[in-house]
A protein has these predicted regions:
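Acidic, glycine-enriched catalytic cores built around paired aspartates
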Residues: 1-215
Length: 215
């Protein structure tokens, strides 16, 4: 992948803006940057995965309200005939609410994914970086993904980036931010805030540090 990228998909305009690239005589795709990282191994649907594992742990292993086989069968049938089980799975703790039950699972899963990814040696000698797919990828991948143990129906979008599952973060932005911090995901999450909750006359935007805040 890296070799083909350097040979066939050069980025000359981008390269001339990089410090040290012209001196090296290398395109950005061929290691011309002062600091070279990547490529990345991208994950999609982190929140969906966390909530699914949390639901299985809670419903199957702690409450013993269903077997793992029953959960698998429910997902295979898109929860048709398993509506009561789906309700139980949906009631399990959700990532993004400062809930230690779900957030501990999130931290473990991200550590596992990033550790496994960084073991991969890449073409230019760097390790592979763990990353997440950004906006819109979750919709396309969700359309191709069957039902999941968190109660999500087949074909519905997966969760976006490393943020919580859509409408699952019900305790506000502070709780969501605390969950990201526990998962070490604060720099690669996004957050939707209702317009009615923002004091626009007090809004502070800092583009340089990618921060948005309120006085």
């Amino acid at each position: 992948c890296e070799k083909l990228l350097a040979e066939q998909f050069n980025l000359p305009t981008f390269t001339v803006l990089l410090e040290g690239a012209l001196e090296k005589g290398k395109d950005a795709t061929a290691g011309g940057a002062k600091v070279n990282v990547g490529p990345t191994m991208n994950m999609c649907g982190f929140g969906t995965m966390v909530d699914s594992v949390a639901a299985i742990k809670k419903v199957v292993f702690e409450d013993r309200a269903a077997t793992l086989e029953e959960v698998c069968a429910a997902c295979m049938q898109n929860f048709v005939g398993y509506e009561d089980l789906r309700t139980k799975l949906q009631a399990a703790p959700k990532y993004g609410n400062d809930d230690d039950f779900a957030d501990a699972i999130a931290a473990d899963l991200w550590k596992w994914f990033s550790t496994c990814t960084m073991r991969l040696k890449m073409y230019r000698g760097h390790y592979c970086d763990a990353a997440v797919q950004m906006v819109q990828s979750n919709v396309g991948y969700g359309a191709m993904t069957g039902a999941t143990p968190n109660g999500r129906l087949a074909g519905m979008p997966l969760s976006d980036t490393m943020s919580a599952t859509q409408q699952a973060d019900t305790h506000g932005p502070t709780a969501a931010a605390r969950a990201w911090a526990k998962a070490k995901a604060s720099r690669i999450s996004d957050l939707a805030v209702p317009r009615a909750t923002i004091r626009w006359d007090k809004l502070i935007i800092s583009y340089g540090t990618s921060r948005l805040g309120v006085e």
